[in-house]
Every structure is written in C-alpha cells, then in structure tokens.
Amino acid sequence: MTARLISTTEGQTMVLTLSNPEHRNALGPEMYAAGVEALNAAESNPEIRSVVITGEGGIFSAGGNLQRLLSNRQQAPEVQAQSIEGLHSWIEAIRTFPKPVIAAVEGPAAGAGFSLALACDLIVSASNSVFVMAYTSVALSPDGGGSWSLSRLMPRQLATELL
C-alpha cells in the first residue's frame, strides 16, 4: 500500500486527507511516515497555523489494514514492532505538535483510526460519525495510544466498555 496521504493547504491550514477509500482509508506504515513528514513540514512553516486530518469518501478510517496486520503476524517480532512503532511515531507527533491538530471525522473512525482521532487536540464529527475501538473483534489489543487517551478523556467505566 502506498502512502495515500494527501497534503494540501487551505489558507493557513494544512489539510491531511487519508486517501484510500477502496480500503476504507486503512492505515499503514507508509501513511504513518508520510504523516510524520507532513507534520514536520507544517511545524517548520510559519504560514501554517493549524492542521486538519480528515478522510476521503465519507470515511475517516477503518484503522489498520487487516490483511497487512494478519500477514505481519507471520513476520519476525522485530518486523512487527517496527510497524507498530510507525503508528506510535505519528500519534506522538500529533500529540506533541505545537499547533492545533483537528480531526474532521465523517463516517467510521475505527481501531487505529479512532486512536488517530483521539490524538488530535479537537475532534469535529459529522452526524454520521461512528467511533469504535474494534480491536477485540479482530483479536488485537488497542494500539496507537487509544486506551491511554480514552482513560483520560472519559470516566474509567465508560472507557473500559469501549475498549
């Protein structure tokens, strides 16, 4: 899967569009790296005052590409760790970004897509938005800091229910 992260500028805002609608804007290592690179460019550009992350085709993100995740299970632990580190690097870059980062969510934000939205300073959601952790339904544990974020944004009991 190629990066499929489109970076545009609208006024003083950098817009990062997850552009992989045929796979429900699934995330992957190339997209993680492109996201970090785009944030580095936005940080060094004094004309950019904010970043918006959105998805193409009425979908924010279904999270990780399950086919890739399943094939990763056959890889050496180091390869698996490298893939997870890419996501965590992007999440950390969002969390520590010195300018506001806004998730503009339309449709589903699931799994790592939900974690990505939670890393942002603000989530603006359309009336058709759906937020779901989804990890346990595919026998995975939450990644991307989703469990950490949820436990700090809402009561523990509700966060536990969502996880």
What is each PLM-predicted segment?
Residues 31-34, 83-86, 116:
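Hydrophobic alpha-helical membrane-association signature
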Residues 1-56, 92:
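Conserved CoA-thioester-binding segment of acyl-CoA-metabolizing enzymes
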Residues 22, 30-31, 65-69, 116-119, ...:
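Short, glycine/charged-enriched secondary-structure capping and boundary segments
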Residues 92-163:
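Crotonase-fold acyl-CoA enzyme core
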Residues 45, 72, 97-98:
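Acidic-histidine catalytic/liganding microenvironments
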Residues 16, 20, 35, 53, ...:
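Terminal peptide-recognition signature
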Residues 4, 55-93, 109, 137-139:
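Glycine- (often His-adjacent) and acidic-residue-rich active-site loop
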